[in-house]
Design a protein with these regions (language model features):
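Cytosolic nucleotide-utilizing catalytic cores of signal-transduction proteins
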Residues: 1-152
């Protein structure tokens, strides 16, 4: 008999006052795993761990990051059925290679360029610039964490 389970881990804290926050971190990590936004090890590392901790302790900070980056793009995608955020995620996963992004999305590379230009217009952040790309990548992860944090 086979059983599947998603387990979320939190950081360690010796202070029992932190228990509620740590349980919340574990819940968010498990929700991310269920959504396949992160693999089991990924939720324990780097940026994911930081964003999970922020979501558990100060979710309004993730909301502020979201509002200042991806909110207008997600709204545009929702109204028009476009895939700007999906294209951005694929572009970042593809090491910012237009040809690889186009192939992964079954698109022409000019379509990818157009979508990235449109994302730039909507967000004010250019995914071709390293500083903006870093902020957009963080915002994508923060959005996934915020969605997982709302799941109960």
């Amino acid at each position: 008999m086979e059983h599947d389970a998603d387990v979320g881990l939190s950081r360690f804290a010796a202070d029992p006052v932190s228990l509620h926050r740590l349980v919340r971190e574990a819940e968010i990590a498990a929700a991310l795993r269920r959504a396949e936004a992160v693999d089991a090890r990924g939720a324990l590392d780097g940026t994911w761990r930081l964003l999970i901790a922020v979501a558990a302790a100060a979710p309004e900070e993730l909301d502020a990051l979201h509002a200042g980056t991806l909110a207008p793009v997600l709204e545009h995608d929702g109204h028009l059925g476009t895939e700007l955020v999906g294209t951005l995620a694929t572009y970042l996963r593809s090491d910012c290679n237009m040809n690889t992004t186009a192939a992964a999305g079954h698109l022409h590379r000019h379509t990818v360029a157009y979508r990235l230009d449109r994302l730039h217009e909507l967000s004010g952040l250019d995914p071709r610039r390293p500083e903006d790309r870093e902020r957009l990548g963080l915002a994508l992860k923060a959005h996934r964490v915020a969605v997982a944090a709302r799941e109960r």
